[in-house]
Swiss-Prot record:
It is found in: Secreted. Residues 46-345 form the GH10 domain. Keywords: Carbohydrate metabolism, Disulfide bond, Glycosidase, Hydrolase, Polysaccharide degradation, Pyrrolidone carboxylic acid, Secreted, Signal, Xylan degradation. This is Endo-1,4-beta-xylanase 3. It comes from Hypocrea jecorina (strain QM6a). Not glycosylated. Gene3D superfamilies: Glycosidases. GO terms for biological process: xylan catabolic process. Residues 17-45 form a propeptide.
């Protein structure tokens, strides 16, 4: 590729990077310098337009990925996000255990880093996650008094959401609260408070940031008429009728090969719930079959409430399912056939 062509292609990206007059975090400033030097190589390996830009032309809000500080400091991850994606979800840094493993001792460093990176690079953020039975500090799990737990939930949600008020587009307020048959999962939250913990968390989040979209997020929402899908629909419809401010449903979409075919029917069923949004929130597919990836993307395109897609990581080597090679880039950060097939259907 000739130098002048490269410069023309790079101009919008480099222009979007923060200028030297902005007071950057030192690590981000160093990262920016590395990105500027490496962008030409990435353009040789990616689409001439970002997947994010392409999906926005189809009426959706974003195509994003999960990441965190450690991954962003590996320059290929950051550069790919810069060039091709429009949204980031913190993989771990906003989970309760990461933020407050010891009561009252808050660790904002990694979460702040991700938020700063996103803001300095014009990326939307999905906050993940406020209430989850896993990666939960022992001191929360050991609470045995309902009134204490109510206050702890309110304090946690209002503190975290309030810190990032106006900076985070959407929050996964509650995560994985259903069993496969659609009943409520047993956790410290449901054991002490029953369904009430859902209302407490959503109301606290709404009060802390009225502009943020508030989601309930879960896995195995990938087949129409599945028990969890039906149970979630019933519960969420009831909670909304009771005034609980639930704006959206997130379908994680951690799929096995062949699982993409059920996504459209499942999204169509979820769209009957009186929420304003749906989203594919944690997409990865065992073996990364092109057919399954394109089926999921086409499903989101076909359902008006589906606002966007987040893939759960960039490179296979960094995936929580690394042995199954489920992502769009291989271990060397080269785009895989599934990546190219998505670009093809979005063009």
């Amino acid at each position: 590729m000739k130098a002048n062509v490269i410069l023309c292609l790079l101009a919008p990206l480099v222009a979007a990077l923060p200028t030297e007059t902005i007071h950057l975090d030192p690590e981000l400033a160093a990262l920016r310098a590395n990105l500027t030097e490496r962008t030409a190589d990435l353009w040789d390996r990616q689409a001439s337009q970002s997947i994010d830009q392409l999906i926005k032309r189809k009426g959706k809000l974003y195509f994003g990925t999960a990441t965190d500080r450690g991954l962003l400091q590996r320059e290929k991850n950051a550069a790919i996000i810069q060039a091709d994606l429009g949204q980031v979800t913190p993989e771990n840094s906003m989970k309760w255990q990461s933020l407050e493993n010891n009561q009252g001792q808050l660790n904002w460093g990694d979460a702040d880093y991700l938020v700063n990176f996103a803001q300095q690079n014009g990326k939307s953020i999905r906050g993940h996650t406020l209430i989850w039975h896993s990666q939960l500090p022992a001191w929360v799990n050991n609470i045995n008094n309902a009134d204490t737990l109510r206050q702890v939930i309110r304090t946690h949600v209002s503190t975290v959401v309030g810190r990032y008020k106006g900076k985070i587009r959407a929050w996964d307020v509650v995560n994985e609260i259903f069993n496969e048959d659609g009943t409520l999962r047993s956790s410290v939250f449901s054991r002490l408070l029953g369904e009430e913990f859902v209302s407490i968390a959503f109301r606290a989040a709404r009060d802390a940031d009225p502009s943020a979209r508030l989601y309930i997020n879960d896995y195995n929402l990938d087949r129409a008429n599945y028990g969890k899908v039906n149970g979630l629909k019933t519960y969420v419809s009831k909670w909304i009728s009771q005034g609980v401010p639930i704006d959206g449903i997130g379908s994680q979409s951690h799929l096995s090969g062949g699982g993409g075919s059920g996504t459209l029917g499942a999204l169509q069923q979820l769209a009957t719930v009186p929420v304003t949004e749906l989203a594919i929130t944690e997409l990865d597919i065992q073996g990364a079959p092109t057919t399954d990836y394109t089926q999921v993307v086409q499903a989101c395109l076909s359902v008006s409430k589906c606002v966007g897609i987040t893939v759960w990581g960039i490179s296979d080597k960094d995936s929580w399912r690394a042995s199954t090679n489920p992502l769009l880039f291989d271990a060397n950060f080269n785009p895989k056939p599934a990546y190219n097939s998505i670009v093809g259907i979005l063009q």
